Each structure stands twice: as structure tokens, then as C-alpha cells.
């Protein structure tokens, strides 16, 4: 009976020696030290690309909603270079309406909002592997005093539907404004041209609607593209709606239209999306402590196994005796 109890006690020790480090690993990698814890055009009109509501301002001009994804490491050490990969997916076969009304390939652009202290990695710190992924992309800060906000584009979408940002993490021992914490990262990405200009006027990449209720009496296709639609309103006025090159009309002469009724199709095939993720700025001292802890656990397990074998030998000797 005593031998059985001793064996049970040894088995429990071995179980604890395995389960404790696993729990400790989850705790260290999940939580930081403390629980406290568009692009180019947007620069001209907005001090910050992210509104208080969390909405990224690029959505003010790019009205259609699309998806965007971001991939970053779960945790990084201070003063290290890592990749932030922004994915802007779309159908590569699509063609968009260009400013002259003709069809062309889509461009993409992105804005990456990093935590304070994180910034674009200097060229001499970027590895050849990351440089190859970057290609000929040129990144810039949103403003001279906002180095943690990076913008890129517009660039050809067929080549850069995945954009790799080389990021340098801060060192809290040097930058006292940063801490070993879990931080949020925000990203916005668009494909294709916008529907609204900064001054509020429409581009030719959107729907054009009737400005009055009445009858379409005449439609003229202009020599350089676009249309003039003449409408006799119900109150006797005569108005002309101008359609720029690009959208195609969906009304015909003699048709009655209401106010804000679409006169054209929607030529837009692009759109804007935003996403967010988190990253932990990990304290290297914690990692060193974790390694030492694992070494001590492994040694403890070895000693437990040796002790168990020694006990079994004694038990066999007693049985033979």
C-alpha cells in the first residue's frame, strides 16, 4: 500500500512538472507586462486618418465597402524589424473607369496606423528577403510628426495586391514613451478610384442621378464622351444634367424620371476596407526568465525519472528478498 501511494505521488509530480510550464507559456505569450495597458489625398485634408469613431477617412471618398486583411507577428522584441503584410484582394480581371472615361487596370493604396514608437524600418535594417517582398514600393509618413502612420500608393493592383511594410519596433529602454504592452494596429486599403473628390464633387466613377422630376426629352452623346440629358420638369422648367465620360445611361428619351432617380449605371468596381489587429511588444527579460524556468523544469523531470527508477530498483530488491 505504501509503495502504491509513493508511486501515485511521483506520477502527480511528473504531471505537474509538465502542465505548469505549459500554463506559464500561455500566460507569458498572451499577456504583456501590464494589463494597463488615403492615403496620399487624405493627407491634404485630414490631420489624422482615423476619426474618433474609429472610421478611417478614406471611406469618405471610396464609398463601396470591400475587405482588407493584415498579418503581423503575435509578439515582437524591442528594436527589431518585422513585416506587416496588408492584403487587398479583388478580381484581377476587372477594369475600372479612368478619369478620361476609358477602361484600365485598378490601382491599390493603403494606410497603416501603428502604435506610437513603431515606425518604418531604415533601409540598412531591412533584410534582403523583406526587400524582395517590398519591390519598388515607396512608403512615407502621414506627416512629419506622425512617423507611426504610413501611407503607400496608388500603385498597380496586379503587382501589389499584397503590400509588405517593413516595421521597426521601439525600445522602451530608449524611448520612454513606450512600454512592454499589447498594442492595436489599424489598416485601411482601397482598390480602384474614389467616387467623391476632396471638394465634395463627384468623380466619373459613380452613379449620376436626375436633379429634377420630369420627362427626358432629349439625350445627346457628346463628341469627347459623356452625355447631356435634357429634362422638362413638372413645373415647366427646362434643365440639363451633364454626365461625364465613363458611366453609361440607363434612361431613354420620353421616359419620366423622379428626383434622385439614377440616370446611369454604377461604373465603380473597387472599394475601401479597414481592419485591425494586435501586437505585443515583448520584454526580452521575460523570455530569458522563461528559458531558465524551462531548464529548471527539465532538470526537475530528469531527477524525478531517476528517483522513480531508483525507487523501482529498491522495490524489486525488497520483493526478491
Swiss-Prot record:
Q: Which Pfam families match?
A: Apocytochr_F_C, Apocytochr_F_N
Q: Give the protein family.
A: Belongs to the cytochrome f family.
Subunit notes for this chain?
Answer: The 4 large subunits of the cytochrome b6-f complex are cytochrome b6, subunit IV (17 kDa polypeptide, petD), cytochrome f and the Rieske protein, while the 4 small subunits are PetG, PetL, PetM and PetN. The complex functions as a dimer.
Function per UniProt: Component of the cytochrome b6-f complex, which mediates electron transfer between photosystem II (PSII) and photosystem I (PSI), cyclic electron flow around PSI, and state transitions.
Q: Which residues bind heme?
A: 38, 58, 61-62
Q: Which organism is it from?
A: Chara vulgaris
GO terms under biological process: photosynthesis
Q: Where are the transmembrane segments?
A: 287-307
One cellular-component annotation, GO: chloroplast thylakoid membrane
- What cofactor(s) does the depicted protein rely on? heme
Query: Protein name, please?
Result: Cytochrome f
Keywords, in A-Z order: Chloroplast, Electron transport, Heme, Iron, Membrane, Metal-binding, Photosynthesis, Plastid, Signal, Thylakoid, Transmembrane, Transmembrane helix, Transport
Q: Which residues form the signal peptide?
A: 1-35
Cite the cofactor comment: Binds 1 heme group covalently.
Q: Which GO terms describe its molecular function?
A: electron transfer activity; heme binding; iron ion binding
Q: Which gene encodes it?
A: petA
Where is this protein localized, as stated in its record? Plastid, Chloroplast thylakoid membrane
Question: Sorted alphabetically, which SUPFAM superfamilies does this protein's record hold?
Answer: Cytochrome f subunit of the cytochrome b6f complex, transmembrane anchor, Cytochrome f, large domain, Rudiment single hybrid motif
The membrane-topology field of this record reads:
Single-pass membrane protein
